[in-house]
């Protein structure tokens, strides 16, 4: 289906691309080299590259599959017949950073944040955590998948850690039937595996069981689980395919399926960001152009068509639930929530890189929908503190930090609220969960 939708989308956007500034075409070799995440490199990366080539007015755009698994070239042709090639190798996120280090890639694709040791390793390329270098191009969710006829409907993150570490060995221990649990996981190079390890295993001091069957390909893993009645695996959202996804609970959160609305706000416990990393001292204008294109409305339309969650801002109705404070219920009765949460750098009141990118998107929405004058409310949340009043104050201060940025562009707010540690979306027992709980929601009337 994706292979049908994407060409139609790209053709539909053709008139919009005619005015793009032309990029230089190298005399020899590829115009751009991208290495890293298989989650990005399988479909999304190639689709974004095709969109950029189309924007450049190239003709006969197509993919050429390499003899090596998970490698391909995206090829186009100028009106004068010159061939333009973009190389994509998708062997896992860590391979992208290694390729930046040895200068065999111009751009790294990653389905997890860059690690501290990689930052140090690549410091000669500049600060890859800076806003210009670290670019969030899409949101994805790790789906926990079962055989489609498995009756289980939800699992919590503690259970997941015990299952994938091999401590819980049978479906009967989970309240089901079927005997031994068969584990399926991505390989060690995969950002998908790194994300699962960081969100589920490492915070609980556990490691993946040696009995797990490992895969470089997301599609092959999903297909294997869907054919194994005793199987369980984790996979990027677009690769659920014929398998069954279950709802996930983290700490005191509500059970959440990997729904678009919950992933867009990053409330879903196993949501994650997908990145391009662009070196500061890179000399390749095609890399700069692809990052800019990916962040544009045209690029985000391709993100959505590829099965990931675009960062396009939308207003959503929210249904009341028993865990909501009265003040929050009063807001949802009359307002709609935007599909963006602002989050912060760890241990800081500074907006993180995605939040900085989202400021302009939220501002565009507010202006386009004529919400500048007292029709926007910011709602802050935080992690649990021993003093609930302090938690409430800190959550309101986070909302004020977002307010300070948006008032510069003329937004007059209706209300700024802070609800402290109410309504957690993640467990407060780990740093990752505390960071997710420190968030600011945007509501419009």
Which residue stretches match the model-derived regions?
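N-terminal secretory signal peptides that target proteins for export/translocation
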Residues: 1-2
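Bacterial N-terminal signal peptides
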Residues: 5-15
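Sec/Tat signal peptide C-region and signal peptidase I cleavage site
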Residues: 16-20
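Flexible loop/hinge segments at secondary-structure junctions
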Residues: 21-348, 352-357, 434-436, 444
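Residues at or immediately flanking beta-strands
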Residues: 31-33, 85-87, 373-377, 413-415, ...
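Periplasmic peptidoglycan-binding/anchoring modules of Gram-negative envelope and division proteins
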Residues: 337, 343-379, 400-403, 407-412, ...
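Periplasmic OmpA-like peptidoglycan-binding domain that tethers envelope proteins to the cell wall
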Residues: 381-445
